[in-house]
């Protein structure tokens, strides 16, 4: 599943190519992935123009001129593929990114007034697109459970420490993976941030000092910003909004580097399981807090 930097990269690409396009038709073949009434589609989607695309956690939100919006979650195998004067593929890459469309994985087709089209493809049918009033987005159950955006300038270290300490008996990795604590951080960036802050992934959240949590707070921000600059990662073969693979993993310090040398101390990177997830860390740099 794409994490915050990958979805942010897709958002930026969609904003570059879709703004002010008018939707003239919508077709879909999987009602569970597009659970919207024909009446709402005809009244609030068809004929609307795209105002902007934004991100909340790991979801995309496309705002429309009708004051409705499309909330999109790509899940594991979702794609957004644009075909027009320019082309791009965003999401899980397979032949659908470059081959003829629609194909057997196409679930939704948006056609615009300039004859360009946006395809939502999803092989495993876990992703979805919901049409709803803008004012109701924040009331979605999963949206209400989301924690702060890590890169929001209004999110400060003291709030971060408070949120972490409310889960004092959980491992620090489980804590920062919890979307109610932080929105958008997943396995890759949890491992990288903990390495940067020199914190063992299985350390209990309640054992970490203010100084350590402040360092982790800044490390999460730095890691996410760096990944966005590099177009995200290629975990699960994720690609960005122009069909280019993100290059973050080429610069990763621990993620998927088990058996290799730590770039900071030269020790061997190990892989263990923490919070049911494969976890990469340096045993010398990241000693467990007692």
Feature roles, as predicted:
Residues 1-4, 100, 150, 154, ...:
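Generic detection of long, well-ordered alpha-helical segments
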Residues 1-4, 35, 39, 70, ...:
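Low-complexity, intrinsically disordered regions enriched in charged/polar residues
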Residues 1-121, 126-127, 261, 277-290:
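A cross-family signal for N-terminal binding/gating loops and helix N-caps
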Residues 22-41, 54, 159-290:
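Basic, nucleic-acid-binding surfaces and adjacent catalytic neighborhoods in DNA/RNA-processing proteins
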Residues 45, 143-146, 238, 255:
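Short clusters of hydrophobic/aromatic residues that line enzyme substrate/ligand-binding pockets
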Residues 70-183, 189-196, 204:
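Phosphate/anion-contacting hairpin/loop surfaces
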């Amino acid at each position: 599943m794409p994490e915050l930097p990958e979805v942010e990269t897709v958002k930026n690409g969609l904003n570059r190519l879709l703004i002010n396009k008018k939707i003239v038709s919508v077709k879909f073949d999987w009602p569970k992935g597009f659970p919207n009434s024909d009446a709402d589609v005809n009244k609030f989607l068809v004929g609307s123009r795209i105002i902007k695309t934004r991100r909340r956690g790991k979801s995309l939100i496309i705002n429309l001129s009708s004051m409705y919006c499309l909330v999109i979650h790509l899940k594991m195998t979702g794609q957004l593929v644009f075909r027009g004067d320019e082309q791009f593929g965003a999401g899980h890459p397979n032949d659908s990114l470059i081959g003829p469309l629609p194909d057997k994985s196409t679930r939704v087709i948006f056609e615009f007034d300039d004859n360009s089209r946006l395809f939502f493809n999803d092989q495993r049918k876990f992703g979805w697109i919901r049409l709803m009033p803008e004012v109701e987005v924040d009331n979605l159950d999963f949206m209400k459970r989301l924690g702060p955006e890590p890169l929001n300038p209004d999110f400060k270290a003291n709030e971060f420490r408070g949120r972490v300490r409310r889960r004092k008996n959980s491992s620090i990795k489980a804590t920062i993976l919890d979307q109610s604590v932080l929105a958008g951080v997943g396995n890759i960036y949890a491992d990288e941030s903990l390495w940067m802050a020199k914190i063992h992934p299985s350390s209990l959240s309640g054992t970490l000092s203010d100084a350590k949590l402040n360092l982790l707070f800044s490390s999460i921000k730095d890691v996410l910003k760096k990944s966005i600059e590099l177009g995200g990662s290629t975990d699960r073969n994720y690609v960005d909004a122009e069909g280019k693979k993100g290059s973050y993993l080429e610069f990763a310090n621990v993620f998927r580097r088990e058996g290799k040398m730590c770039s900071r101390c030269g020790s061997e990177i190990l892989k263990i399981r923490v919070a049911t997830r494969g976890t990469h860390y340096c045993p010398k740099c990241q000693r467990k807090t007692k």
